[in-house]
Amino acid sequence: MSESQSELDKYGTNLTKTAATNKLDPVIGRDAEIRRVCQILSRRTKNNPVLIGSAGVGKTAIVEGLAQRIVAGDVPESLRNKEIVSLDLSALLAGASYRGEFEKRVKNLLEEIQKSKVIIFIDEVHTLMSAGAAEGAIAAGNMLKPLLARGELRLIGATTLDEYREHLEKDPALERRFQQVFVGEPNLEDCIAIMRGLKERYEAHHKVSISDTALVTAVELSSRYITGRQLPDKAIDLLDEAASSLRMEIDSSPVELDQLRREVDRLRLEELALKSENDPTSEQRLRSITNQLSGKQEMLNTLQASWNSERARLNQIGALKEQIDIAKQSADIAQREGRLEDASRLLYATIPQLQKNLAEKLEEQDSAPLVSDQVMPEDIASVVEGWTGIPVKKLMQKDAKQLLHLEEDLSKSVIAQKVAIGVIADAVRRSRAGLSDPNRPSGTFLFLGPTGVGKTQLVKALASLLYDGEIVRIDMSEYSEKFSISRLIGAPPGYIGHESAGQLTESVRRRPYSVVLFDEAEKAHPEVFDILLQVLDEGRLTDSHGRTVDFRNTIIVLTSNIGSRYLSDISLEATTAHEYVNDEVRRTFRPEFLNRLDEIVIFEPLSQSDICQIVDLNIESLNKRIKDRRIVVTVSEDLRRWLSKSGYDVIYGARPLRRLIQREIEDRLAKLIIEGLIHDGQTASFDLSGGAVNAQVCS
């Protein structure tokens, strides 16, 4: 018996013993699932529940909750004094190198389980199907079937929906011996209750306090922004990482102290260097440095003393919280074991005294502490931003100011398209203020207009300003064939390339906060737009692997040249031209597609005065490219007017101007640099003389 018991201890973990020492996290809710598991375990035959649900919904927690109820005696009579042992199949397999050794281990283990009447829990129960099944050996699942059928072995399994379908359903003989218990994702209210139940454990572990608003924020933000994972797992992860980050900040130096220490070190180095100099300027500088160093050192000493005192107080608070948590666990164990005297001493003497000491320490807090010891919603938002790249933190003053002046900033890069700029800016402000529909993309637009008027440039400018340059560009001319749709979402199963991800879905899955640009939309096959209907309406798209990709934090822009000939026709009035363009759009795209767009924006052709401003933009862009060489390019007013006149074309927009500047200015500048006629720090001045462009180098 002792030898067999050692086998059970070797390959399993006793969850009831762990629960008896209060080492398991409290399980909040899930009463219906735990009751259903108890009902199945109380059956005469086929008393083997299998918990089925997505990863992270709390299947293992239900078994831990059952173990806690067994310890507390809150179970039916048939389950009282039972033990739940979590079996580790990998430990059972490890080292079984000889044929028959694995089967012998399983047989000995099963005999011991039958004698001791423990309940076995196997996480990832689908691994039973393949465990040990090599070179003609019998799989563990086949060895368990007779015992499971007779009810001589009580087994709780846990697996995901996909693994259950893929492994257990393929073996009907094994599947019928299990009773399914579906575990769904908890709703937001239940998840918040779960988080509140776990709050004290995480406070004691990280030695910080967690505000209730942070718990609610963790649930709400994880539900909205973190896709592909389930509650409550993702919300708990958010809270854990935010608390860990705060603890690390407390254990290290505050930013103010660190900056001041670096400043003092820099001044000391400069002081040492100046002591070896004898000239009057150096001596004067040395006196100034010495005075600065004296003042900074005094500030550093004061701040360091304040921080040492504050850190000691925070550590004492953390230690008191940990002691309270341990005392509460000890009181629970004492009550359960009938040691009422010990329990009353802990509950009515030790714990109240510790709580009183904690309250006194909390009152000692400074009005302006160097670092906070409380996890706030902003800390949760910072973690979400780190995971997803989505700026979900509350709008700072700098961000708000930038959003209010977004039109001005965009107008610096895109000339003369005020309507389009206004529409885009309004969509961004709605999204950042939290007013846009949470189940749709931040904005969906169709940009129409002649070539070279700034359709793509506006998208690039927006991405540069607000999205850190994150732009997913899909060139629709590459999707002119019907079968090319598979490149967007991935090839279907059985086709070459199924393992490769879709060009669109994978880009957005990796960067959910970005601008998605479908360039030259009219060149794509009409059926390509069918897959965009779900994106435009619901903000989601399922790829070829069945993964749902979230588009709710993207701005989607389609550009097209449809009807541009009407806009370039100077004989037509603007309203008439717009009507012709809209008619052609309706003929090209299906009504259900157009009806899902937020706005159809028509870009106007550029005028002569607009081209003059674009000349300045191009010269400014050139100066940025050669900034490292410290060379500056200037253009005379005559040359500026000549460039705008010669580079103006109502049909081709601003692109001919770019080619003209490249030919007349950039090519000449390149020759000057290569010939060594212009050096770093000099200015290249371009002007017009006798109808030809001349370059002059100035110091």
From Swiss-Prot:
Q: Which top-level group of life is the source organism from?
A: Bacteria
Region NBD1: start-end pairs: 8-185
Report which residue ranges the record marks as coiled coil: 236-367
State where ATP 1 binds.
G53, S54, A55, G56, V57, G58, K59, T60
**GO biological process terms on file:** cellular response to heat
Keyword terms of this UniProt record: ATP-binding, Chaperone, Coiled coil, Cytoplasm, Nucleotide-binding, Repeat, Stress response
Q: Where is this region: C-terminal?
A: 606-699
- Give positions of region: Linker: 186-389
Family statement: Belongs to the ClpA/ClpB family.
Q: Know the name of this protein?
A: Chaperone protein ClpB
